[in-house]
Amino acid sequence: DGSIPQRIGSALAAHLFKGNPYYSMATSRKLRVMISSRCMDHFPGPEGTPLTDVRRELKKSIEAEKLFGAKAFEVWINEDAEALDHSKDSWDACLKQVRDCDVLIVLFNGHAGWAKEAGDIGICHAEYIEGLNTSRSKVRLIELPTCAATSDVAQTDRNNRFKSFKQSESAFRGGIVPQDVPTLGAVENQAQRLGGL
């Protein structure tokens, strides 16, 4: 029940702040993260895991992280979005997600993604550009092993434009992820041998 001063303080606070917009508490929202990459490509190679599965696992892992005991992140991946065809509407919807997110994680494997027109840039390329144009500081690029070559000339051209653009930017890069990615246990064992843990 609390002491008399506590009850008076609570009653006074309720009276003073009730309905007063100047004294209302700020409401916090979760940080919005978007993961941009191809979905159907495989990581780390043709026999590896589809990037869709990698993206879902990343989403689950990021959303499980807590800050001061509260879940702090909300992750958007297009696999969980409302189904749209490859039209102007789905293109615009993806770019809107880029503008609205607080952090954009680009999983770069050199594949630019689908395009509205044969000579255009791909959706992954467009998302990367939109992120840099919206706020460079929110973009994080993780370089994966390069995707396999394609016989589609227009797609090859898009991929080459994307690779050239990425090379011209000085965005934060998380490094190149090798094909033979060690397990967390192997990394911890190596760190212990070196006296790091």
Predicted regions and their residues:
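Hydrophobic/aromatic beta-strand patches that form the interior of the parallel beta-sheet core
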Residues: 105, 139-142, 179
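C-terminal interaction surface of TIR/SEFIR-family domains
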Residues: 5-12, 17-23, 27, 147-197
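Amphipathic helical hotspot of TIR/SEFIR-family domains
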Residues: 112-154
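Conserved short-loop catalytic and cofactor-binding motifs
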Residues: 82, 119, 175
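A general structural detector for well-ordered alpha-helical segments in enzyme core domains, enriched
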Residues: 54, 58, 93-97, 124-127, ...
